[in-house]
């Protein structure tokens, strides 16, 4: 479903290696039959994440765009989102019926947030392998994202992380804002993310938009 300014735009951020691109891949593959989707990735000097999505068959190549942000990927999603806004506009011109655009941030800035001008909903991905103190450290991604994803829960026993502590800290730091524990390799928790995007974003599957 398109909003007043076009498709629903979901920003996906988080540290390098947390599972952002894996989540992008799964969301595309899980939603592409029901919605008209495009994906935009941000990398500093390459288009590696976009190329990964193409190789994985997430969407057809013409629906995937890679933005090369240069040295400051944080700026490209926040202070000066013009490159990403241009990429969204190009996708809309190619696919006028777009329902959903997924936008993956680049870089490793733990404080990176999406401009409201660029993203309608934000998902922040962290992973258990970075330690169970991450949720308690706060920062805008942890406290203010619309949905927090705590990924790689299967690694907890191997890195000495307590999922109970991460759960309690996430509740304390986020208040009423939702979070999901996931193992994206096995798709555990994926349905809750899909449900969040559809419900919070007001998406209606193609079959329902007669």
UniProtKB/Swiss-Prot annotation:
<dbReference type="GO" id="GO:0005525">
    <property type="term" value="F:GTP binding"/>
</dbReference>
<dbReference type="InterPro" id="IPR003495">
    <property type="entry name" value="CobW/HypB/UreG_nucleotide-bd"/>
</dbReference>
<keyword id="KW-0547">Nucleotide-binding</keyword>
<comment type="function">
    <text>Facilitates the functional incorporation of the urease nickel metallocenter. This process requires GTP hydrolysis, probably effectuated by UreG.</text>
</comment>
<dbReference type="GO" id="GO:0043419">
    <property type="term" value="P:urea catabolic process"/>
</dbReference>
<protein>
    <recommendedName>
        <fullName>Urease accessory protein UreG</fullName>
    </recommendedName>
</protein>
<comment type="subunit">
    <text>Homodimer. UreD, UreF and UreG form a complex that acts as a GTP-hydrolysis-dependent molecular chaperone, activating the urease apoprotein by helping to assemble the nickel containing metallocenter of UreC. The UreE protein probably delivers the nickel.</text>
</comment>
<keyword id="KW-0996">Nickel insertion</keyword>
<comment type="similarity">
    <text>Belongs to the SIMIBI class G3E GTPase family. UreG subfamily.</text>
</comment>
<keyword id="KW-0963">Cytoplasm</keyword>
<feature type="binding site">
    <location>
        <begin position="14"/>
        <end position="21"/>
    </location>
    <ligand>
        <name>GTP</name>
    </ligand>
</feature>
<dbReference type="InterPro" id="IPR027417">
    <property type="entry name" value="P-loop_NTPase"/>
</dbReference>
<dbReference type="GO" id="GO:0003924">
    <property type="term" value="F:GTPase activity"/>
</dbReference>
<dbReference type="GO" id="GO:0016151">
    <property type="term" value="F:nickel cation binding"/>
</dbReference>
<dbReference type="InterPro" id="IPR004400">
    <property type="entry name" value="UreG"/>
</dbReference>
<keyword id="KW-0342">GTP-binding</keyword>
<keyword id="KW-0143">Chaperone</keyword>
<dbReference type="Pfam" id="PF02492">
    <property type="entry name" value="cobW"/>
</dbReference>
<dbReference type="GO" id="GO:0005737">
    <property type="term" value="C:cytoplasm"/>
</dbReference>
């Amino acid at each position: 479903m398109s909003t007043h300014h076009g498709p629903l735009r979901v920003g996906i951020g988080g540290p390098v290696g947390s599972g952002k691109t894996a989540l992008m891949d799964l969301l595309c593959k899980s939603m592409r039959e029901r919605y008209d989707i495009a994906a935009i990735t941000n990398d500093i000097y390459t288009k590696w994440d976009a190329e990964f999505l193409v190789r994985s068959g997430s969407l057809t190549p013409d629906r995937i765009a890679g933005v090369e942000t240069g040295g400051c990927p944080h700026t490209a999603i926040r202070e000066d989102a013009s490159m990403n806004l241009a990429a969204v506009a190009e996708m809309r011109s190619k696919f006028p019926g777009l329902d959903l655009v997924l936008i993956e941030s680049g870089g490793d800035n733990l404080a990176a947030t999406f401009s409201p001008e660029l993203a309608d909903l934000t998902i922040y991905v962290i992973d258990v392998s970075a330690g169970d103190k991450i949720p308690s450290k706060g920062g805008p991604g942890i406290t203010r994202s619309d949905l927090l994803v705590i990924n790689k829960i299967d690694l907890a026993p191997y890195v000495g992380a307590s999922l109970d502590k991460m759960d309690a800290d996430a509740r304390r730091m986020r208040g009423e804002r939702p979070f999901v524990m996931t193992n994206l390799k096995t798709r555990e928790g994926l349905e809750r993310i899909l449900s969040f995007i559809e419900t919070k974003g007001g998406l209606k599957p193609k079959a329902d938009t007669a």
